């Protein structure tokens, strides 16, 4: 298949709000992919690169786009050719590797037309927002293969990713899907939580009574034990066993020889409060001297679910049954603090205690719900205290997919009184309605200080925006050394001037506090 065909499918999917039309277009594209293109094609249609990041940053992509010839030339790029080129970019290493990656990218863009360039750039930047979420794509795989959507979703849940399931479904049908099952030692995608505004809303949504557990500000882990063999996986399903000897020791000491447990690993201070998230994440670097780091930065594991315990797979079991199995598998000090209640006042006090002890908040869980691996289901609801800052828009990037034609991704900065300038803290495209996107595009075009046909448009720092975020982390990417976690736009503050924006000292105070 030509890349241009896939780019056109992406454009069409982004352009329609109709779920059934999205599914139909994606299913047709999946059917047309050659067998050796199905895995990569399914990944790209989901907006992902099969191997994750490939060593090219946003600045390089934008510079390559700006330098590309006005019109692409040569024969049309195929999916296989592009996949091979991206593979060469990902594996380039050593002296001169940055130049080699750039030359490969330049060669791709030189052969690509405008739609293909936008598709490639959005894919490389992780910004292919076309409304083809995994649920939509799973339904498209089911339609393309003539299989029940529930079976495709279950296989994807157990595989931890949809592309291998797409390959199996399209190549082997139901027999291919039957191979996907929970195996101790092989990770499954973790269950995720939706958001509730407060504990009262969470209790109402869950039918009155629910289990509340502390939401720890740590690293999600999935721990597997099969006899003497222990493996630990991250939220992204990466094997991190070597990085967490403390967790390995806990599993080996457990009374049950066969376990799959879901939980968090966290670095704690002497007073029991958590270190900042970024400090915990130092234990999970890819180049890590664990023997040197572990004594100074030990990890503590807290578990909150059992997927395999007592000789049984528990995915379909109610939450209360899985918790009882967890109680038998690990001692109380290795489980998250928990409260079962229907009393909003009691739930509120539990939340305040978690926050006072430095945790993110609580997760409310339906007692009779199964474990929905890989889904952000309504059976788990997180309640956190969000922070807000008034920041200034420093630049914006043109959107892709259904946001094409709008300035979407905002560069956000805090005021620096010492220089009179602004310090960038991150970017966000989240929280914006279509009306807000249309309004801000016109305002930012009027404030532009650079060409409007560039990928990124710098603007005069005049617009103040109220931004909600979940925390602050250290980041070498930005000049102030700090970045916002999960930032999203709440509203523009037209009543405020840039000099009324929050200062970098305020941000540093929040980080230190």
Curated annotation (Swiss-Prot):
Domain of life from the UniProt record: Bacteria
Coiled-coil residue windows: none
Keywords annotated in UniProt: ATP-binding, Cell cycle, Cell division, DNA damage, DNA recombination, DNA repair, DNA replication, Ligase, Magnesium, Metal-binding, Nucleotide-binding
Residues binding ATP, per UniProt: 213, 220, 235, 264, 304, 376, 382
Pfam families, sorted: DNA_ligase_A_C (PF04679), DNA_ligase_A_M (PF01068), DNA_ligase_A_N (PF04675)
Catalyzed reactions per annotation: ATP + (deoxyribonucleotide)n-3'-hydroxyl + 5'-phospho-(deoxyribonucleotide)m = (deoxyribonucleotide)n+m + AMP + diphosphate
Task performed by this protein: DNA ligase that seals nicks in double-stranded DNA during DNA replication, DNA recombination and DNA repair.
UniProt-listed NCBIfam families: dnl1 (TIGR00574), PRK03180.1 (NF002868)
Name listed for the protein in its UniProt record: Probable DNA ligase
Gene name tied to this protein: lig
């Amino acid at each position: 298949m030509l890349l241009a065909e896939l780019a056109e499918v992406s454009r069409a999917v982004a352009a329609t709000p109709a779920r059934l039309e999205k599914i139909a277009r994606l299913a047709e594209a999946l059917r047309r992919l050659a067998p050796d293109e199905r895995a990569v094609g399914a990944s790209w249609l989901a907006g992902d690169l099969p191997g994750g990041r490939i060593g090219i940053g946003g600045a390089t992509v934008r510079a390559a786009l700006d330098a590309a010839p006005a019109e692409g030339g040569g024969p049309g790029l195929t999916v296989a050719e592009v996949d091979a080129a991206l593979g060469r970019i990902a594996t380039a290493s050593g002296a001169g590797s940055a130049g080699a990656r750039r030359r490969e990218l330049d060669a791709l863009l030189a052969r690509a037309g405008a739609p293909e360039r936008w598709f490639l750039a959005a894919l490389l930047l992780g910004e292919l927002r076309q409304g083809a979420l995994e649920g939509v794509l799973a339904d498209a795989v089911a339609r393309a293969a003539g299989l029940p959507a529930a079976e495709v979703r279950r296989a994807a849940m157990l595989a931890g990713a949809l592309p291998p399931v797409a390959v199996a479904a399209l190549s082997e049908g139901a027999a291919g899907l039957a191979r996907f099952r929970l195996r101790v030692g092989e990770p499954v995608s973790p269950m995720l939580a939706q958001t509730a505004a407060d504990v009262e809303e969470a209790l109402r949504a869950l039918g009155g009574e629910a289990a509340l557990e502390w939401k720890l500000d740590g690293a999600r882990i999935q721990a597997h034990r099969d006899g003497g063999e222990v493996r630990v996986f991250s939220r992204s399903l990466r094997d991190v066993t070597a990085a967490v000897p403390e967790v390995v020791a806990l599993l080996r000491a457990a009374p049950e020889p066969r376990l799959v447990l879901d939980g968090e690993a966290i670095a704690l201070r002497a007073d029991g409060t958590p270190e900042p998230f970024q400090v915990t994440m130092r234990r999970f670097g890819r180049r890590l001297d664990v023997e040197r780091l572990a004594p100074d930065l030990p990890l503590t594991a807290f578990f909150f679910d059992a997927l395999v315990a007592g000789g049984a797979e528990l995915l379909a079991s109610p939450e209360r049954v899985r918790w009882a199995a967890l109680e038998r598998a690990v001692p109380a000090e290795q489980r998250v603090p928990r409260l079962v209640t229907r009393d909003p006042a009691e739930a509120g006090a539990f939340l305040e205690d978690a926050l006072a002890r430095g945790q993110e908040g609580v997760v409310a869980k339906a007692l009779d719900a199964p474990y929905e691996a890989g889904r952000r289901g309504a059976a788990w609801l997180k309640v956190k205290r969000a922070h807000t800052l008034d920041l200034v828009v420093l630049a914006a990037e043109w959107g892709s997919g259904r946001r094409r034609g709008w300035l979407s991704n905002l560069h956000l900065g805090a005021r620096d009184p010492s220089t009179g300038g602004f310090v960038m803290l991150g970017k966000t495209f989240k929280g914006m309605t279509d009306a807000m996107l249309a309004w801000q595009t016109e305002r930012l075009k009027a404030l532009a200080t650079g060409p409007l046909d560039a990928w990124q448009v710098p603007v005069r720092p005049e617009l103040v925006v109220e931004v909600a975020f979940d925390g602050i982390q250290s980041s070498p990417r930005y000049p102030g050394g700090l970045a916002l976690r999960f930032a999203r736009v709440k509203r523009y503050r037209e009543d405020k001037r840039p000099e009324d924006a929050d200062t970098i000292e305020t941000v540093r105070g929040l980080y230190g506090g």
